[in-house]
Amino acid sequence: MDIKKILVIGSGAIKVAEAAEFDYSGSQALKAFREEGIKTVLVNPNIATIQTSKFLADRVYFIPIQRQFLAEVIEQERPDAIACGFGGQTALSACVDLDEAGVLEKYGVRVVGTPVRGIKRALSRDLFQKAMREAGIPVPPSSPAKSPEEAIEIARYLGYPVVVRVSFNLGGAGAFVARSEEALKARIYKAFAQSAIGEVLVEKYLEGWKEIEFEVVRDAYDNVAAVVCMENIDPMGVHTGDSIVVAPCLTLTDEEYQTARNISIGVVRTIELIGEGNVQVAINYAGPEQYAIETNPRMSRSSALASKASGYPLAYIAAKLALGYRLDEVLNQVTRRTVASFEPALDYIVVKHPRWESDRFGVTEGLGPEMMSIGEAMGIGRTLEEAWQKAVRMIDIGEPGLVGGPMFQSLTLEEALKCIKDYVPYWPICAAKAIYLGVSVEEIYKINKVDKFFLNAIKRIVDVYKRLEAGEVDLDEAKVLGFSDWQIAKALGKSVDEIRAMRRRPVVKKIDTLAGEWPADTNYLYLTYGGQYDDKTPGVDYLVVGAGVFRIGVSVEFDWSTVTLATELKNRGYRVAILNYNPETVSTDWDIVDKLYFDEISVERVLDIVEKEGNGVTVVLYAGGQIGQRLYVPLEKVGVKIGGTRAKSIDMAEDRGKFSKLLDRLGIKQPPWLYAASVEEAVKLAEGLGFPVLLRPSYVLGGTYMAVAYNKEELINFLSKAAKVSGEYPVVISKFMPRGIEAEVDAVSDGVKIVATPIEHIEPPGVHSGDSTMVLPPRRLEEWAVKKMIDIAHTLAVELEVKGPLNVQFIVQDDVYVIEANLRVSRSMPLVSKATGVNYMSLVADVLTHGRLAVDEERITLKPSKWWVKSPQFSWARLRGAYPRLGPVMYSTGEVASNGSVFEEALLKSWLSATPNKIPSKTALIYTYDPHHEELLRQAAGLLSWRLEIYTPEQLGGKIAEMLKWRKIDIVMTAGITPEKDFHVRRTAADTNTPLVLDSTLAVELAKAFNWYYKNGKLEVAPW
């Protein structure tokens, strides 16, 4: 193919069902294209990604992934081709839109990889069904519908239960199971609202059938390889993104396996796939029937998992195939021994486990066909039990495995059985407790139809746990079944140190994709008790600890810092390893560092690795966010060499009591605060300070269980929950200052000098910094306040002997008040690095390797030359039953950013980059039931009334839901937390993809920016 320049479309902000796996696949594609000498142009407003760093793409555009912006990029750049398969559903839909609008034809841009007709055939439920039937590939009894009435008719014909699936959408958005006509009518409007083309498929629900998935690659010459077979432990009806998944497939007969493989290959041929795709197949547990359910003609969450599970670099190979290579011409870069037509063989088992945040959002529903999980982890072991228990620890919910943790201990039999029946998140822990209390595997199978093979694995774990509790010590058996030292110690009534001294050490094994069939030199490692000898690899100088499972508050920003820091160390000539277990990420890719340990981030595992690597290795804990903070004290205690800031400084900053005393000693102001060790004491102290008060437990991230209490009842209600987070630590009560401006400083220090960037938030204090709209350089803050913020950050860096990254948060009112300091990489460091043009991780690497910053001045303040705005991405539409709101708890799942020569331009481009935001053209619903926000929302309504028809709930009465459903309201602006009054309004807005603005200050700023745009303000399309 004669391609000189290619346009790659990213996936934008991280949201439920579209996460960091597209940073991984996009980064790999950019590398593969660059190897061929092709110039790459990337459009992706996700500032936190690695792919938007200078070293991967030739040009990067931080702009919304919408047709008018993409058309301008094409006009300016004139690419020869466009790659649609590496940015998830967002990129595919954008490509189809550009094609249908005639933009690609107008500029002569070719689609590389799967053709647009193939994409449509895969994503339209109607076209998919027709194509499969024509090709003789079995599909479930089903029919497409273009209206709710048609859907109801089809369901009557098929008979209940039915599952409704949505065309052209992401992660099963809007999909649901209906067991009656009433249930169908209640949710069908949301399904249509979630479809880009207003089409759904009504399908007979294959209850209890097995669901498996094949990752398949195909070249332009019709050569096909079925790379990995993955099996969902949960049966049909639970979205594959919310299922626990094992690879390879474990419960299929050879005949079932071959049939499913043939169906998958038939599907990709029918849609003319070129590159990589996945096919979901349903297998009847009671008979020979199998059906093709759906396909994704692109890299997906499953393909990221399959790549990491098999050591087969799917995204890299898919990019080469898109350029016209044959499978047998592409070398597998992991093994350097095999070509892409070689199907991997696995001599280990992987278990992928999702992580949910249902508590945070107040969601109580069980799992279904619409994906709701926020992150995922992948455990690797030589037994199913080992991999599974590892995966449960990795999702970091406080459980030490399938048995022995707080959830396991507290469940009653009744609760456990209900949890299994409803597929509540983490149901395998409930199954373990039910078995522990005497329920048989057969009974559990009858309730939830999970294959007995998997239930028996849980039973084996429970049996060993019972024997440990009875004092029978067989450490080897427990370790082979994935028990941690802590689990064993607790069951035996011994200390963790005693168990460590008693047990044998794990061995290091390589993932070589060949199951040892012939030698392959890979750097992709895991630790296991299912072996006797280590696979030998040369030692490293640094072990950089990654961010682990993604969750609210920990996302791709921390992967950016892990990878960027590791790369900077490698560029300085050091040998570097990364420890991480998140299959979505770039940090768990094979070609980033000298060694990848795909394993747990825990004291036990880090000590195992340090023993293997030798005492010369320096462990770096501050790049991955909060997960590393917990390891400082226990690792330093046993003499592990830790790079950068010392453990005592971390503890001083993390412990709110110690930190406050430090601020008092240094004469730095902070909002008045007090400690409470009990609820009664808290009530008394809060009344003394005067409501409202802010409540913060010690050691949290993402604002978990932080709250503003406006009265005594709210305070008591909150504290009963907060104890769940950190029972040993008291709660801090501080005076809440809602009138100030919240701001922060990102910095790097060597304990003497500091390089820093100030950031301002649009939303007031009380909105979590991760949910705030950030502005660089500060716009409302006066110069004295910015200077004082930098002074304070410098003073703290010197006092705490910071050797590395630092983030300090402030409220500026009549003076500058410090809220908190974090001695680690912050969520905003990718933003400040890209906005200022100075890579903060390069500065961190200087301090780590040489002990000092390579700058002359004591204090350097960096500010960008343009306006930059970072906006949060919320996933309210995904979280069934959640009440959309803002507060001190973080709710956003991702972020986007853009720049502009004026503030309004930067704000609008950034805000438009988050879905489902669009500039309103006709109508707006603007209201609040919270007196604190009335004045500002009145102002916003006044600013827009010349151009838009402004509604209030009182005017519309019972018509609101209908108007939202039929897209008669362009935007909803509201504020405050009043679910008893407006739950239905906000929920319907989220379900119908209506833009929601949930803060009054932001509403005013957006109203001004809309007016600027209405009066011919220009949204420039320019590369970074």
From Swiss-Prot:
ATP 1 binds at R125, R165, G171, G172, K204, L206, E211, G237, V238, H239, Q280, E294. Mn(2+) 4 binds at E820, N822. Mg(2+) 1 binds at Q280, E294. Keywords: Amino-acid biosynthesis, Arginine biosynthesis, ATP-binding, Ligase, Magnesium, Manganese, Metal-binding, Nucleotide-binding, Pyrimidine biosynthesis, Repeat. Binds 4 Mg(2+) or Mn(2+) ions per subunit. Residues 917-1024 form the MGS-like domain. InterPro entries: ATP-grasp, ATP_grasp_subdomain_1, CarbamoylP_synth_lsu, CarbamoylP_synth_lsu_oligo, CarbamoylP_synth_lsu_oligo_sf, CbamoylP_synth_lsu-like_ATP-bd, CbamoylP_synth_lsu_CPSase_dom, MGS-like_dom. NCBIfam families: CPSaseII_lrg, PRK05294.1, PRK12815.1. Its cofactor is Mg(2+); Mn(2+). Pfam families: CPSase_L_D2 (PF02786), CPSase_L_D3 (PF02787). It is an enzyme of class 6 (ligase). It comes from the Archaea. This is Carbamoyl phosphate synthase large chain. Residues 397-536 are annotated as: Oligomerization domain. It comes from Pyrobaculum aerophilum (strain ATCC 51768 / DSM 7523 / JCM 9630 / CIP 104966 / NBRC 100827 / IM2). Residues 129-323, 660-849 form the ATP-grasp domain. It catalyses: hydrogencarbonate + L-glutamine + 2 ATP + H2O = carbamoyl phosphate + L-glutamate + 2 ADP + phosphate + 2 H(+). ATP 2 binds at R696, K735, E742, G766, V767, H768, S769, Q809, E820. Residues 1-396 are annotated as: Carboxyphosphate synthetic domain. Pathway: Amino-acid biosynthesis; L-arginine biosynthesis; carbamoyl phosphate from bicarbonate: step 1/1; Pyrimidine metabolism; UMP biosynthesis via de novo pathway; (S)-dihydroorotate from bicarbonate: step 1/3. Mn(2+) 1 binds at Q280, E294. Composed of two chains; the small (or glutamine) chain promotes the hydrolysis of glutamine to ammonia, which is used by the large (or ammonia) chain to synthesize carbamoyl phosphate. Tetramer of heterodimers (alpha,beta)4. Mg(2+) 3 binds at Q809, E820. Mg(2+) 4 binds at E820, N822. One of its GO terms (molecular function) is carbamoyl-phosphate synthase (glutamine-hydrolyzing) activity. The large subunit is composed of 2 ATP-grasp domains that are involved in binding the 2 ATP molecules needed for carbamoyl phosphate synthesis. The N-terminal ATP-grasp domain (referred to as the carboxyphosphate synthetic component) catalyzes the ATP-dependent phosphorylation of hydrogencarbonate to carboxyphosphate and the subsequent nucleophilic attack by ammonia to form a carbamate intermediate.
